[in-house]
From Swiss-Prot:
Family: Belongs to the class I-like SAM-binding methyltransferase superfamily. RNA methyltransferase RlmE family. SPB1 subfamily.
Enzyme Commission designation: 2.1.1.-
Phylogenetic classification of the source organism: Eukaryota, Metazoa, Chordata, Craniata, Vertebrata
S-S bonds: none
Record's protein name: pre-rRNA 2'-O-ribose RNA methyltransferase FTSJ3
Amino acid sequence: MGKKGKVGKSRRDKFYHLAKETGYRSRSAFKLIQLNRRFQFLQKARALLDLCAAPGGWLQVAAKFMPVSSLIVGVDLVPIKPLPNVVTLQEDITTERCRQALRKELKTWKVDVVLNDGAPNVGASWVHDAYSQAHLTLMALRLACDFLARGGSFITKVFRSRDYQPLLWIFQQLFRRVQATKPQASRHESAEIFVVCQGFLAPDKVDSKFFDPKFAFKEVEVQAKTVTELVTKKKPKAEGYAEGDLTLYHRTSVTDFLRAANPVDFLSKASEIMVDDEELAQHPATTEDIRVCCQDIRVLGRKELRSLLNWRTKLRRYVAKKLKEQAKALDISLSSGEEDEGNEEDSTAGTTEQPSKEEEEEEQLNQTLAEMKAQEVAELKRKKKKLLREQRKQRERVELKMDLPGVSIADEGETGMFSLRTIRGQQLLEEVTQGDMSAADTFLSDLPRDDIYVSDVEDDGDDTSLDSDLDPEELAGVRGHQGLRDQKRVRLTEVQDDKEEEEEEENPLLVPLEEKAVLQEEQANLWFSKGSFAGIEDDADEALEISQAQLLFESQRKGRQQQLPQTLPSCLKTEIMSPLYQDEAPKGTEASSGTEAATGLKGEEKDGISDSDSSSSSEEEESWEPVRGKKRSRGPKSDDDGFEIVPIEDPAKHRILDPEGLALGAVIASSKKAKRDLIDNSFNRYTFNEDEGELPEWFVQEEKQHRIRQLPIGKKEMEHYRKRWREINARPIKKVAEAKARKKRRMLKRLEQTRKKAEAVVNTVDISEREKVAQLRSLYKKAGLGKEKRHVTYVVAKKGVGRKVRRPAGVRGHFKVVDSRMKKDQRAQQRKEQKKKHKRK
């Protein structure tokens, strides 16, 4: 015999438990919550009537979502436990007594919402139960029509049966919007659905037959349609082909394609385009691909059709241009023919045409005069508007006491001969101070010219003569040095241009009150005095680190500068590079060697660029330094002169060895025989030549665990190196140690400042002891010194002790009692959380 399942417990779903947790009296409360979330009918309601309200879950939801001063009435056959701000009645909604009781409670009020979640006692047969529920819904609708206000809502539960459609038709006659829905809280196996009726029409008179079950649920005989009625008598007209179109293949000409108003529609109907015009066929746009596409348009894709449209556009432009040229030629020929005919005409015809020409000239002259008058009037209006606008501005300035009455706006501009505002740069200032030198220029132009200016073109000619005198190798060397020299000149000219631009931006007539370096330092101090840099400013160690980093960077850069000349051959230093270094050195000093010349150039560049903006100097350093670094870091390179520059080899990077590697290294370093034996033993039966990735990972891991040869290392040595490795791992990294030291230093500094403030508070005489304690507590709290974590002592409880545990002997402060059960519960909770995470993934 089969075992019957527990029906009651299986129906306890998540909404059942949610109702228990939130305090609702039934799980059906969530149905109303979901309906209200979708249709929003409770927030605006001021009065509500709940029919079949027991046990009161829907009343609880209504009291929660409706305004506080709302009127809520609940009716049911069974008594309902009292709820705050809710009136409950124990009546039968199908009787007249219930209607009288509701009128007594509501008085003259009309409700905005009527709810009905009622259902009869079920269990006899499904047909009887469905009819009883439909009858109960009809009675609820009758009450709703009596007490519902215009535009109100009626929400009811209905069973899906054959009486559902008649009910829906009655709802549609009385309400503006009727929607049937099934909320998520309603069980899937349940036959209930909820009908939301909104916008009550409130008719003056409702036919009583609507609420009569015999009439409302009366079966209507539907006449069956015969076969002749189902078959359509007239055959519909076939669509898809044009009338009179007997063929599906349409051949058109290219001229029709060019004249088509809608080319896309033309291509959809055409099958082939014939290029019948010889001139269009010879056009450059008519390629072989276009000819192939024109042969069968129905098989073309989007790309080919777009190419045909572009081809049509080009041809239309060509044809339009050709027609314009023909029209111009025709006009010229016609004008020449008319002149000939005019010469051959009689004098009488000329006399008849003269009056007409004179009339045209007179009319044209009058039109020109009218246009000139209109332009003059417009110009006068424009000047008048401008004058009025200036007067209005002047009047406003006088009213605001910005100007004197006798001063006009026209006097504001500097129209004098000596205007200081026009001087915007150093060059203009020099021109003003020098005066007019045009006379001197004319005097110098009259003098005979002894000096000869050699242009760049003549220099190029000298270069060509030099090329003929030198060997190819010497010529290559000279050209290389010349290129380097030109690069240096370009950089120096760029720096000078930047200087000139800065001088032009600054007004030379304005004398700065402070020097530029002092002004830049004050601007930097003003920037770093903001609140966001307060913590950085207080930390002395941060400034120390920055200064140390700058010193280290300078020393490394000087070292690189000193290493570069050492790597060059001696002949490269003395013979070839000495002219270059002499060019780079300052004019007032002479370089004794190539290295001194290079350092001299560096110093000159630094001094020259220090006055310029910091960003430009940093960009120059960044653009020069990496070039030198790249030349050193890469392999040996041969310069244009044929000399090989030997790079400085960086030391090899050390590998980080594990304890096993350290022990093997000690064995290898101890004796050559042990090293040789170790190498020989590395070729054994456990050694294979598989590539990485050929074997599965689980197989490789298993081989490493079970098929490995023991190394000739003792346990003591391995333990020694493991201990040493653990000590190394226990040390904090440099950054962590520095951060901890900085944190400790900040805390000590903060503690010292707080101690000084506390001494000042203690020495104050004007305040009481209680105020002193409060101020000291606030000082230590702001300093972050009173935020010590409370120490918790864990006490393991024994079995049979019970819930109340006394403080054990020797335990001070806060303590917590734990047991093995709590540990197991925590582990179970962690396992559940892990399972939930895996399910979400």
